[in-house]
Amino acid sequence: MSNSNRKEITGLNRMTPKGLKELCKKDKLYQTPRLNDVLYLHYQGFQCIESLEEYTELKCLWLECNAISEIQGLEKLSKLKCLFLQNNLITKIENLDPCRELDTLNLSSNHIRKIQNIGTNVLPVLNTLTISSNYLKDSESLSDLIQCKTLSVLDLSNNRIDDILIVKIFEQMLNLKVLVLQGNPVVSRLPQYRKTLILACKELTYLDSRPVFPRDRACAEAWKRDGYEGERKENNRWNRAERRKTRESINCTIRMRNSHRPPDQQDPLLRSSDSEDDTCAETARKKVALENGCVDDLWEEVSGEQPISEDGTNSSSSLEDNDGTSSQDDLIAEKLSNRRTLEGRPTVLYETEVSNVKSANNDINIFEEGVGKASQIIIEDKPVTKIKLINEPSCMNDKSAMNCTSMGPVVKENDFDEDAEIKNVDDMVPCQNLIKSNEDINSEFGFSSKLKQDFDQTCTALRNDAECKEFDEELTIKESESKPFNEMYDIFAAEDDKLNETLDLNLNETTCPHHVHDNFFSEQNKMPSFYEEDIMINLLPKTKEKTLLEKDSIIENEKCAHDLDEMGRQMEEDLAELRQSTQNLIGISIDETARTDSETDEEDLIAQQDPYSPLLKQQFKDRRMKIMLTEETKAQEESLSDRNIALSNESDQDDKQDQLFAKILDDATENIPKRIFGTGCDALSSVWPQEECLLQLTLPENKESPAQEDTFKKSITNSTSFEKANEICVRMDQKMAEEEEALGKLLHDLEGEINNVYDINTKVKYEENTSTNESDAVSICTSLLDDIIVGLTFDEVLCHEKPKSFEFGLIESDEEFSYSFEPKLEKLVPPALEDPARGKSLRECLDTFSDFVSSMADPKLPVMLGRNPTSGVEKIRAAQELLKTKNLSDLYKDTAESLNSQVAKEIEKRKRRVAASATRCFNQRDKYDDTLELVENRLMIVKKDSGDLEELPPPPPLISDTESEDDNPTEDNYTPGNEVHRHGTKTQDSKEHLMSNLLNQNQDDIIEGKKNDSAEDEFYSLEAMTTFGNLDAEFFQKLDLQKVNASEDSEPAINCMRSYNELQAYMKSGSLNTQLNSEEAEMLQTMCSRVASDVDKPKSQNSKEEEEDDLLKKMVLRMKEYEEREHQLQLISHETSSELGPIKLSIGGSKLFEQNTKIPESVLVHSENEPTRNNKPINTKNTNDKESSDIMEKNGDPSVTTSFKTSHKSIDDDIQSDVSTDYESGEEVVVVEPPTLSEAVLKSFYSDEFEADSKMVHELEEATRRNLRRYNPNIMHISTSNHPFSTNNILPTKTSTSELSEGAKAKWAKIAERLHEFLDPETIANLNKEQFGESDECEDSQDDNITDITVEETNLKKDTKLVVLEEYNNTHTCDGNSCPSKLDDSDQFASLKGFEKIKETPTHNMGLSSVMSASQNKTSETLPNEIGNKITDFSSFKTSSTDLINSEGVKTEQIQCNLQILSDEGDVVVEELSVNAQVSSFK
């Protein structure tokens, strides 16, 4: 089974038409191959490309993660655009000629060593090539990339390219925009890798992991030109530009904020703090000033920086001045470093400077009133010492007001449809509000002569500038400098003409004559004093330095001329916008003749100022004609209206005139181009997109009457004519019917052609009236039925039975993915075995499979496949269901921050705890650094610094790893010192006095320990014990007990140490015969009496404890009787000991011999009331330690020691308890405590002799095992009915009779015949060679029921002390008087905990003593059988030849043995066998 699965998983597949259709069905693609444009064939194990001839319309083919080694089979895929072949075995790029439209090719993770056959002649439109993780190495392997003229994305990452000549290849790829080279050695070999590639690839926009920004390219070019210093300067220039942009945006925000604040609460604007900017600006200013001092003034005027006026009103500079000053240095540095054309427009060109909003509004309104009253506007000429445009405002409120005024709707002709209108209602609202506010203030303020004076100065300056264009001198430096100014002044003259025309339009209705144009240019021949000072002829020879300086000045002047030219164009556009806004505010005057002349003049001006855009000029003309027609219609309607309406219109025109004048003044002070949207605010207007230009100059909002709409719009039909509408509907219906008929015919032809080759389902859908052709329905149904019949025939062959019925799903079109419903057939595999391993353990999978095999082998058996899962599986499934519940989100309410805070708190708490522990340890270490000396026969601590004497600290209490869960008050009173470690001592004086002194000293130490501070108590922890163990060892090395003077205080400690040394000597010698003298016997008798007195004391009112106390009392009485019998048994053991016979082979756990015993009903009833106990043995090491402390001797026999302990029910009875915490004694025993020494000291003493102890225990264990194998032929037969323990604790002591031996051998012969069925021959041979006595431990480990010998051997291995317990021996001959007297107490004693069996243990020197097992009881129902099983197992294995057989009768029974054969790992049951046998037993 595993081989077939492995072959199926690792085997390669082939592309077949049937398999491809199945994949299309799985991916919900069309079943007709040529209808698919995408095909997913990845992760299929294909080894070659084939069977794709029918998929002619494919545009995207996925073939990654297969085993394809060659590119082939693509001859018919002429429309393929994307081919994905990554993660294959391709070694060469070939056979791509048919795919002429291939755009994307992915060949990553293959074995390609050279790029070839992908040039423009093969793949003319290849755009993306991904060939990462291959074997490309040098420039030769990449040389063919030069032929890829259209390749723009190239991924060469994670190859082996190390040739730096690849840069030349990339340099010849003109369209390369994205390049990935990371993961190649060449990246580290190329010096300045990123800059080199940026310079080599002119169109590169993305390199490796990040884009190539314009800044990166500029820095790379500077690095190539001027080295690292040039790169640094270029980088600083970009940084300054970014800082300036940020500063300007912040200043703009501050200005907007200040516009809503009073003057005293306004924030200052940010100034440039870059010293380098200031230095560059100063240097540039000095250079220009050397040749022409007026250049600085010109730059100041262009950038908006004005000096303080000679008038006294503008002595304090405004916030706008500060902004202009702060940006001037940066602007000059930027322009000089770039040496490029001036981009963008100045943010502020013309601003007026007045004191505040109140004075500005006052001047405007008074000036408008003066215009209405005056009959003529006279502009006087005044001498001006310097070119001065219009001063800046001193307050932000003025600027905001003017901005609102200038943001009105502006008209510009465009190429939209005639009916297109762009309405800018939002911009009209602030303008109307401003006009109204100006009208309200008109009556409150008077005329100001200051504003008129400024206006006159401006006009004079413009006139003087216009006269400069007539200068005609030789081509000198001065002439080159004056050339750009002349051009600018020409533009100014054109602007003045436009302004005059605007004034003519505005004041046409008034009768006041005016001649603005003549006044502007009345002094054309006058030479301005501005240039008189500069025109000087220098006849002196020029030096080389001066010549170079003049050349630089010429370059700067040319740059300024170009910039001024750009500004002139901007002014033209701004004036055109101003003109359009003026027309929107005033409209067309009543005098049509004058209006026509003004329009003609405007056209001439537009032709002069915008000669570069004839398209816009034509659009202006068309739009103007439309507006004229509209206004003519309005004029005709107005002539038919009332005279009152006409008068009101005239008053409205007067209001419009006032509004116009205010608008003119505001626009004259701020002439900012009104750009509404779009990025690149620093771009020239000449390069604006056409769509953006059309949206910048919005159309006015004109409310047209229905008559006007009829002029430009003509409805298709008459809404009141039903006949015409019906006729149109009929015509449209006919047209749709014809189209539908033609389409139906075309579809019919296509279906007829397709159905001849393929079987398809077609359903044509229409949203409106439809008609379908179903002429081929018969052929389609026939083909479907044929497919179904073939499938049914195949299923019938597999299932050997015909299905009863089939449900046909909906026949869908290819658009809806055909065959969406699978036929409901009977499944070959049962549902329980579809996915046997999901959510199941290995054992459950094997059980399910075995149930399936059994159900297939014998159909009559009940089906077991639906059995309930085990508890472990139920927990897993419950956890999976819990994960799917909706309430699970409540468990994840804790955010990452809260969890991190909790973790931080826990870490901090742990650190504090560790710090406190370390502090305590080091505090105690300071004490141990002091010296130890004997003062008056007492061990004292002498302080190093002061010399003071201190007592030794009390010994640390025993700290256990686990805690007992029993609520037993006696365990709380237990202390580690309450143990007696006396295995044997020599004769010593006053033992009773020694024990009492030790007890008193321990109590005193405990009292003194309680009085110590908390630091002393906390010191006794596990960490401190391990830390200062070496210090304790050093202390005891200094202590020499032989040199200590004997006294009352030191005598207990010295005696204790001597007793310990004597004990070690006894254990080394291996002697087990420990004789006690009279003093020791009296001491033990006293201890027994104390125990009895303690038992008599009532400890609690609990009924269970009282019952246990009664049992203990009875145990004490019985043990006295046991001691007498044991003394007699010791005499018999020497006579009847003999060697054990050979041991035969047995199979673990099988029951071959059973001896039924008669158990009184009272015992069974009493045992049913006992708590259920586990069959595992108690920790024998702890048990023996406890038993050794409870020695009781009543008869004075020095060779017999006994111990009793009751076990309380615990929750963790099945878990082996810890040695230091398994204290379950229910009685209070008087104990003798050792001297108050630390545990580390005792450990050091104990570890010194540990190896000797282990050796002694091993020898005792071997001696005990030899005694167990001895054969006792002369054991007396005793009736089991006369002994109180005959029911549960009978041990066989005599070998069976010859008939029983022959019967057992016959049964074993039958079993041995079948051993080869479940054991291999090698194992059987090893078992036959091995003696049972040698493999005793191995067989015991396989046995389910632990035998008595196993318990004894485990006790001897785990303990370092030999504990001999008394037990019954059934071979002892009881007289008739003593045995019946003990029958009354047999029931009670049989129910005691801890006494389940009694075994005999013959020894070599001591005689026969027995070891009592303290194992736990089983349930009350199986108690008799359990005892019987253990007895029979012991006898069947022939581990003892002293079996006691009751010869009253023989019982033959039929028994069954279940055997489980495990796998090699021992965790899976491979086979289960059942063995039947007949067993004869004696009654």
Swiss-Prot record:
GO terms for biological process: axoneme assembly; chemical synaptic transmission; cilium assembly. GO terms for molecular function: dynein complex binding. Residues 1183-1196 have a biased composition (Basic and acidic residues). Residues 249-282, 300-327, 945-986, 1167-1213 are annotated as: Disordered. It is found in: Cell projection, Cilium. Its main location: other. Residues 311-327 have a biased composition (Polar residues). Keywords: Cell projection, Cilium, Leucine-rich repeat, Repeat. The keyword ATP-binding does not apply. It comes from the Eukaryota. One of its GO terms (cellular component) is axoneme. Residues 185-223 form the LRRCT domain. LRR repeats lie at residues 34-56, 57-78, 79-100, 101-122, 125-146, 150-171. PANTHER family: LEUCINE-RICH REPEAT-CONTAINING PROTEIN 46, PROTEIN PHOSPHATASE 1 REGULATORY SUBUNIT SDS22-RELATED. Belongs to the DNAAF1 family. Cilium-specific protein required for cilia structures. This is Dynein axonemal assembly factor 1 homolog.
